[in-house]
Amino acid sequence: MKKYKETYIIGIDHGYGNMKTANCCFQTGVTVYDKEPIFKDNLLVWNNKYYLIGAEHKEFSADKMLDEDYYVLTLAAIARELNIAKIYSADVLIAAGLPLTWVSEQREEFKQYLIKNETVGFNFKGKDYHIRIVGADVYPQGFATIVNHLSDFSGVNMLCDIGNGTMNIMFVNDKKPNPHRCFTEKFGTHQCMLHIRENLMRIHHAEPPEEMITRVLRFGAADIDGDYLKTVTNTAKEYVADIFRRLREHGYDSKLMKLYIVGGGGCMIRNFAEYDESRITVNDDICATAKGYERMLEMKLIKNGGAL
C-alpha cells in the first residue's frame, strides 16, 4: 500500500488461484451465506450477506466480472492492507491488472466493475471498514513486476508470467515492452494440478488432498509415500517441459535472449527444471505483481499531477 496525498493506493493481483496485495496472499475463493455461518474465520459481511473468504478455489473464468465474487475478494484485499496500518476509514485507489492480451478489451469494463460502489461499508474478520473508492486503473499482468527495474532488460528478453489460470508472455527489447509480441495461454499451474490428480488416480487409485500436491509443487518435497512423490514429481517435470516447448513456439531461444519468469508458477521452474541461472531469472516474490501495480499507478499520479 502506498499513500499519495490523502489517498491510499492498493495494488491487487486478482489471481485465479490466489489474491495478492503488496503484503498479503490468500486463496481465491468465496462462499456466500444468507445467515451467519458456524465457522467465521475470514468472514466478510457486506450488503446483508455473509462471505467466507478463501474457503475453496473459484473456478477458472476468462471473465472476472460475471458475478460478485471478485468484487467481494477485492474488499477483503483492501481490508487486509488497511488493517496492517490499523486504518479502517480511507479513500482508496485500486491498482489492478488483467492478462496481457485481455487488457485492451476488458480494461474499461473491469475498472467500472471495481468502482461501481463509491462508498462501501463492510465488516471483515470482526472489524468495520468504511472506504471510498475514488478511482481505479488496470495494467498488464507480468509487465508490472519488472517496471521498477527495466534498466536490467537491455537486449532481447522474454517475460513469462505463470499464474494459476494463465501463462502470459511478453518480449521486452532494449528496456521497452513489445506490444505486438504478447501472448496469453490457458496453461497455468492449475493445468498441472489436474494432470497430477489424473495420474495419481490412474497409477495409484488415490485422491490425495490438493494441499499435499501444492506442497510438493512449492517446495519439491512432502511427507508422502515415495512412489506417490515420484508420480507428482514426474508429472510436474512434464508440465515444466511443456512450458518451455510453448515458449519456443512463441520465439524463445536461450542462445539469443534471456528469460525472466514471474508469478506463482516460478517455483515449479526452480524445483523441476534444469536451467542456466545466468540466462534464466526466476522471481519468487508472489506479491511482485501487486507491488508493480501500485508503483505504476503512483508514477501516473505523479506525472499527471494527481489525475488518473
What do the PLM-derived regions correspond to, one by one?
Residues 169-174:
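PRPP/pyrophosphate-binding module of the type I phosphoribosyltransferase fold
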Residues 1-159, 176-191, 203, 211-308:
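Nucleotide/phosphate-binding catalytic cleft detector across ATP-hydrolyzing
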